[in-house]
Amino acid sequence: MGTPSRRKPAEDAEVIVVGAGPAGSTAATYLARAGLDVLLLEKTTFPREKVCGDGLTPRGVKQLIDLGVDTREEAGWLHNKGLRVVGGGVTLELAWPTLANFPDFGAVRPRQDFDELLVRHAEKLGARLHEDTTITEAITDGRTGRVVGVTGTAGKGKDKRPVSYRAPLTLACDGVSARLALSLGMGKREDRPMGVAVRRYYNSPRTHDDHLESHLELWDRSDPANPKLLPGYGWIFGMGDGTVNVGLGILNTSDAFGKVDYADLLKQWLKNTPEEWQFRDEFQTIPIRGAALPMGFNRQPHYTRGLMLLGDAGGMVNPFNGEGIPYAMESGAFAAEVAAQALHRQPNQRERALSAYPKALKQEYGGYYTLGRIFVKLIGNPEVMRLCTKYGLPRTTLMKFTLKLLANLTDPRDGDVMDKIINGLTKLAPAA
């Protein structure tokens, strides 16, 4: 816990973390580990469901290992060997690359279980969790405009009551809704990509698949004489518990974005999959649900006036592959390190330390996300996507390079030629 000398009598914690998803729980864990008094506020109660593909690349697994989470299969994880890519009449299995910086396996776990695992980990290290607490806006100092706390409601039904909490630093981990940022007038950038994903679970014999599977082409073959290419991309991730997570995503660079029924689109694709996979309504375990994917730093600045934006609240989903969990967790680690350094200084010296957070994000992801924006614009053109699928998939070496690029899996030093090319491109690209 934090020392009393750093916390003023009127303050409820040294750091308030709003949202107990991967970003919030990761930040709370590292902050508590650093000896700070952390208040973690979550609008729901655990366990709770989140719309997600549930699949982690080695980048995500690394964050779990760094956090101290047991990632063995005996601990409830289903490991995978790599990515299976399907498109253009080709099916290609690509093993995760062997790297110094990342493990050589991915993992799958339902978000309902995953998020609770992370938040309990944070609690064990000393973070104080308040569930059923919906934070709606920031409290600002009338003189300086600095964020000094948050306000909202706690409880349900007739027990609901207004609440407010105060701390010298607040971490906004409140997801795509970004209520705290919006309460300060921080809107999203329209020049950044946005995606939408929908998914459903099915009881299926494919539950123990040892690869994450990505479909680059989604076909509606209900009329065999006139097959139609549907917009978007699909995934099939075995969960290891008898079920499979099946979903699709679509980017706002597609002409179909916002103009189609995404749930119907998913059904159109799945009705053309083999019967034995059981991707039919009678085998569903829950209804189709969807969520937005804020990409490429679509909300900035990531630090201002005592408020840090983490994960989806700061638009940190990878534009290349729609992956959000690793970047949410990494932003939690960055934010916690900067916050710990800042809060051990005198108040008049903290701002300089806190300004290191957005700089660290830009250095780590800025050039990569700029390349991602270019990639998203290109694949939004169906003809470009068709050509990439037709001529790219049969070339294994090219696809190995593509896997490293899309999953952001390279060694920064002493990597192979592919690593050097990717790292060089990200350094040359202007920061997002």
Which residues does each PLM region occupy?
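Conserved Rossmann-like nucleotide-cofactor binding loop
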Residues: 23, 46, 177
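C-terminal helical "tail/cap" subdomain of flavin- and related membrane-associated enzymes
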Residues: 340-432
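Glycine-rich FAD pyrophosphate-binding loop
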Residues: 32-52
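Conserved N-terminal glycine-rich FAD pyrophosphate-binding loop of Rossmann-like flavoproteins
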Residues: 45-65
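Predominantly flavin-linked oxidoreductase catalytic cores and closely associated redox partners
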Residues: 121-278
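A conserved beta-strand/loop capping segment in the N-terminal third of enzymes
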Residues: 61, 66-116
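FAD/FMN-dependent oxidoreductases across multiple families
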Residues: 76, 135, 252-338, 344-347
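Beta1/beta-strand and adjacent pyrophosphate-binding region of the FAD-binding site
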Residues: 6-23
